[in-house]
UniProtKB/Swiss-Prot annotation:
Membrane-traversing stretches: 67-89, 98-117, 127-144, 148-183, 197-218, 221-252, 260-294, 297-319, 322-338, 346-374, 383-404, 418-441, 449-482
Pfam families: Na_H_Exchanger
Free-text domain note: The C-terminal intracellular domain is subject to extensive post-translational modifications and binding partner interactions which regulate transporter activity, scaffolding functions, downstream events and localization.
Localization annotation: Apical cell membrane; Cell membrane; Recycling endosome membrane; Early endosome membrane
Family: Belongs to the monovalent cation:proton antiporter 1 (CPA1) transporter (TC 2.A.36) family.
Protein topology in the membrane: Multi-pass membrane protein
Name assigned to this protein: Sodium/hydrogen exchanger 3
Organism of this sequence: Triakis scyllium (Banded houndshark)
Highest taxon of source: Eukaryota
Tissue/organ expression: Detected in early distal renal tubules in the kidney bundle zone, in proximal and late distal tubules in the kidney sinus zone, in absorptive epithelial cells of the intestine and in rectal epithelium (at protein level). Isoform 1 is expressed strongly in the gills, at intermediate levels in the kidney, spleen, rectum, spiral intestine and skin, and weakly in the brain, blood and rectal gland. Isoform 2 is expressed strongly in the kidney, rectum and spiral intestine, and weakly in muscles and the rectal gland.
Length: 832
């Protein structure tokens, strides 16, 4: 195993070296393109050689400049992906070192190789590439898969940390650095108060990319994760406003700043944050409406999710609003309606494509953070400034978290403990957002731009590598509650919903408007108005809570039914419109025979619906002859070529055979279950029903064979199906099964299975039993009313209780009616 891994690593290293060798001519070619004189000379010499040696048409030519840019991009993506594969070959490494730290180290190595080969930093992470192409997929993935309940339940806490906490960190860091500078401990720097505040505003914000990369591997509990991650998303508005305000003040000059400008900065915060949120909500509404009408173009509907979400990001950035808030709330607000409108294939496509884009963008970001650092022209070292920056951002982060948490705990139901505060303080990671903002600074106005860039790179490396390495041992040492990735049980869902209703009722009665009250009002508003506008009608029905619970119980029924049948070795898993005989307990006498063939009713060693898989044992000579004939024909006859139906379509994806069978089984199951709901669903009038029963029984008495003692003859009831009969093919092209004639012998002991979901659970022998209080000598002729109401006795008392159609079903309890197909033989008729 070790040799295989070492060989794989060696191959990856050799491939990386090959990529770098291919990338080296890129810089030279780019330099040649930027230098017009050299390009002209090269063209002249090439033209002269062409004139001197005209060889005519060339079959193959090497045109590197033609494919240079896309080729290099594809190679870098390939290198980053291969590096990710190599990291995960060893679980010991990835369990200790975060993937983001490994990618930064890989970027440093590759950047060093490129610098040694070409002596120029030809590959760097530019702000344009980061903000327009790499950041949107990551934020969209975070918003689309956001746990809305936890997010909105802790929204007040998240906004407190995001707004007040970010302003606190930016102001205290900038003022503290400026105070130390005035003391003369940093040397001679070309910076004033506004420059230090500008640096504090860009270094204070918690980075969402870094938080996602580290905290997803730690697996802390949901509340702690959503608070830290929500803060990193929502502090973008504060970061953008502070950065733009102080950057404009620096460009204008400290002497030209007026008091009105500070007021405009405060107003711009609300405009940027609320405007970005509004843009995201509007585009989420548009996306939900568009996906409502994509029923006939299923193939392209996943594209609308990405295109419209990306347009929300670009629109907010065009209007100088918070683009991160726009695409975040676009994903949060549209996820419910989009998932309801899209088909299952499109939902899976969106899920995997979004995860792939986010993971790829995150990989490229951290790798290029390492590559960008290998550039001596951007480095300026100042030990005091760098070390004090690390100290101030860590100390003020702890102070801000402790003070804000102490205030918030007075209003929170679930308190944030000391352990949670330690993790929140330690989880203030900085990343590519700070690096991209500091690169955007203009060196003409900010004299210490190179020092700010160097310090930002050190801060990013320290928080991502050092804090990322130590946060997992810290969480284990503090015994922080971890998240449990499991689907909640149906019982937990029902109790949780009941508690929500109880809490909202308590808040309503007490007159207090809290989270539960607002959530209940929003749910009602969404159900009455929004869902009807942004969901198609079929999606509204399918998302009904009662039906969803019923579907889950049906799924559990089916799983237990199939698992029990496989354990018993039965093969009678046939869903048909006729009755199905399912009996896991063993052979018994059945009054009502099924329409399943005798061959299929035999027990076999595996579940198979083909005759040649049925074991040839305990069968009649005719059955054995049929099996032998089947084997002979299967093996020796000419097999014709299969004819495949053309399933290609530009607008639809053909469903597989398994999906068709699953759909057919579900439809037939629901058909049988819905038949049981007809009396209660359609509002059957039992008075009319009993009157019709009297008429039918009167007509039966005239045509029945009466015996001298006044009793009706007991008939053996069985269903007969013609030999050539078939179940109709379903509309969706599902499978069908041939039905062979049923046996007329009521004493036949079949080992098929009685499906409790389809067959009545009551004992059919009750119709043939004589009550113990009636002797053969004494026969009392009951009245007409007594004929409709059976006397209460231990034997038939269960007939008077509500009848549940399945011991694992949630079907409504129905009153047990007297079956018309089975006349009560123990009730004597009146003698004339």
């Amino acid at each position: 195993m070790g040799r295989n891994r070492s060989g794989c690593v060696a191959r990856c290293v050799s491939l990386t070296a090959l990529v770098l060798l291919l990338c080296c001519p890129v810089v030279r070619s780019s330099e040649a393109e930027t230098d017009p004189d050299s390009h002209t000379e090269h063209g002249d010499s090439h033209g002269g050689s062409r004139e001197g040696n005209d060889t005519g048409f060339q079959i193959v030519t090497f045109r590197w400049e033609h494919v240079q840019t896309p080729y290099v991009i594809a190679l870098w993506i390939l290198v980053a992906s291969l590096g990710k594969i190599v990291f995960h070959l060893s679980e010991k490494v990835t369990s200790v070192v975060p993937e983001s730290a490994l990618l930064i180290v890989l970027g440093l190595i590759l950047g060093g190789i490129v610098w040694a080969a070409d002596h120029s930093a030809s590959f760097t992470l530019t702000p344009t590439v980061f903000f327009f192409y790499l950041l949107p997929p990551i934020v969209l993935d975070a918003g689309y898969f956001m746990p809305n309940r936890h997010f909105f339940g802790n929204l007040g806490t998240i906004l407190t940390y995001a707004v007040i906490g970010t302003v606190w960190n930016a102001a205290t860091t900038g003022l503290s650095l400026y105070g130390v500078f005035l003391l003369g401990l940093m040397g001679d720097l070309k910076a004033g108060l506004l420059e230090f505040l500008l640096f504090g505003s860009l270094i204070a914000a918690v980075d969402p990319v870094a938080v996602l990369a580290v905290f997803e591997e730690v697996h802390v509990n949901e509340v702690l994760f959503i608070i830290v991650f929500g803060e990193s998303l929502l502090n973008d508005a504060v970061t953008v406003v502070l950065y733009n305000v102080f950057n404009s003040f620096v460009e204008v000059g400290a002497g030209n700043v007026q008091g009105l400008d500070y007021f405009k900065g405060i107003v711009s915060f609300f405009v940027v944050s609320l405007g970005g949120t509004a843009v995201g909500i509007i585009f989420a509404f548009i996306l939900s409406l568009v996906t409502r009408f994509t029923k006939h173009v299923r193939v392209i509907e996943p594209g609308f999710v990405f295109v419209i979400s990306y347009l929300s990001y670009l629109t907010a950035d065009m209007l100088s609003l918070s683009a991160i808030l726009a695409i975040t709330f676009c994903g949060i607000c549209c996820q419910k309606y989009v998932k309801a409108n899209l088909c299952e294939q499109s939902i899976t496509t969106v899920r995997y494509a979004m995860k792939m884009l986010a993971s790829g963008a995150e990989t490229i970001i951290f790798m290029f953070l390492g590559i960008s650092a290998v550039n001596p022209t951007i480095w300026t070292w100042n030990t005091a400034f760098i070390l004090l920056t690390l100290v101030f951002i860590s100390v003020y982060r702890v102070i801000g978290v402790v003070i804000q948490t102490w205030i918030l705990n007075h209003y929170r139901v679930v308190q944030l403990e000391i352990i949670d505060q330690v993790v929140m303080s330690y989880g203030g990671l900085r990343g590519a957002v700070a690096f991209a903002l500091v690169v955007l600074l203009d060196s003409n106005y900010v004299g210490e731009r190179r020092l700010f860039v160097s310090t930002t790179i050190i801060v990013v490396y320290f928080t991502v590598i050092f804090q990322g390495l130590t946060i997992k041992p810290l969480v284990k040492w503090l015994k922080v509650k971890r998240s449990q990735h499991k689907e909640p049980l149906l019982n937990e869902k029902l109790h949780g919903r009941a508690f929500d209703h109880i809490l909202s009722a308590i808040e309503d009665i007490s007159g207090q408007i809290g989270h539960n009250y607002l959530r209940d009002k929003w749910t009602n508003f969404d159900r009455k108005y929004l869902s009807k506008i942004m969901m198609r009608k079929s999606a509204q029905i399918s998302r009904d809570k009662i039906l969803s619970v019923f579907r889950e119980l049906n799924l559990k029924d089916a799983i237990s039914y199939v698992s029990e049948g496989e354990r018993k070795g039965s093969l009678a898993f046939i869903r048909s419109s006729s009755d199905v005989n399912v009996d896991f307990t063993g052979p018994r006498h059945s009054v009502v025979d099924s329409s399943v063939s005798a061959v299929l009713r035999e027990s076999t060693s595996e579940v198979c619906l083909d005759m040649h898989a049925v074991e040839n044992r305990a069968k009649s000579p005719k059955d054995r002859e049929e099996i032998v004939t089947h084997h002979m024909l299967q093996q020796h006859l000419y097999k014709p070529r299969k004819r495949y139906r053309l399933n290609y379509s530009r607008h639809k994806l053909a469903r597989s055979e398994g999906e068709k069978q699953d759909k057919e089984i579900f439809q037939r199951t629901m058909k049988k279950r819905l038949e049981n709901f007809k009396p209660t669903k359609l509002g059957t009038n039992y008075t009319t029903k009993f009157r019709n029963m009297k008429k039918e029984r009167a007509a039966k008495k005239k045509h029945s064979d009466a015996v001298p003692n006044g009793r009706l003859a007991t008939h053996s009831v069985s269903f007969h199906v013609n030999k050539d009969s078939e179940v109709e093919d379903p509309a969706d092209g599902g499978i069908s099964f041939l039905i062979t004639p049923a046996s007329n012998d009521a004493d036949e002991t079949g080992t098929g299975i009685d499906n409790p979901s389809f067959s009545n659970e009551e004992d059919q022998s009750i119709y043939q039993m004589i009550p113990p209080w009636i002797s053969n000598e004494e026969t009392v002729i009951p009245s007409q009313r007594a004929r409709l109401q059976i006397p209460r006795s231990p034997t038939n008392f269960r007939r008077l209780t509500p009848l549940q159609l399945s011991n694992r079903s949630i079907d409504a309890f129905l009153l047990a009616d007297i079956s018309d197909e089975h006349p009560l033989s123990f009730l004597p008729e009146s003698s004339m």
